[in-house]
Regions:
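Extended alpha-helical surfaces
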Residues: 1-177
Length: 177
């Protein structure tokens, strides 16, 4: 089992309510020369969302699937869609159902997204418990960095710009009909 004491010690502490320290690309560049080739490819798979056989990634990907299926089921129920394809017959977890329910009840889409990001963050914390200087610690860091990168896209300016663009498109469509 490889240990990456120096690399992990040089990484900044990530906090969900903190800033994005650097991009996932910068992280991969940093890792390229300091981890084994096999572990580097594993980190790439983690960040791309590609299926992997590593137990840590399998557990996280299974968790993501459970969250996504719960989102589909609860959204379809909210829209009164009864197609069996929307039903979640897979594994379920109470905290996932509760968080998804809370997120879908939010009027503010940003708050809903932050609830879901927090759910993922906490799960990564659980998975990485007792992993400090190994590949699991780096995988957790990479996936948290990816979550922070996603969160950094939620800016007021970009949100307002997107709203104006959509509103303008609707106005144009109404004017043309």
């Amino acid at each position: 089992m490889a240990s990456y004491y120096y690399l992990v010690a040089t990484l900044p502490t990530l906090r969900l309510d903190g800033p994005l320290s650097f991009s996932t690309e910068t992280f991969l560049t940093l890792c390229k020369t300091q981890v084994s080739e096999r572990h580097y490819h594993l980190l790439c798979k983690a960040l791309s969302g590609e299926k992997a056989s590593h137990p840590f990634l399998k557990a996280y990907q299974h968790f993501e699937t459970m969250v996504n299926k719960e989102l589909v089921e609860q959204r379809s129920r909210k829209l009164s869609l009864s197609d069996p394809a929307y039903r979640n017959d897979a594994d379920k977890e109470g905290r996932i159902s509760d968080t998804v329910r809370q997120a879908l009840a939010q009027e503010n889409v940003l708050e809903a997204e932050l609830l879901l990001l927090t759910l993922h963050w906490k799960f990564l914390d659980e998975l990485a418990t007792l992993h400090t200087f190994d590949i699991e610690a780096l995988l957790s860091f990479a996936l948290k960095l990816k979550l922070l990168q996603r969160k950094s896209l939620f800016t007021r300016e970009e949100g307002n710009a997107e709203f104006k663009r959509l509103f303008s498109n609707i106005q144009t469509e109404i004017a043309n009909n």
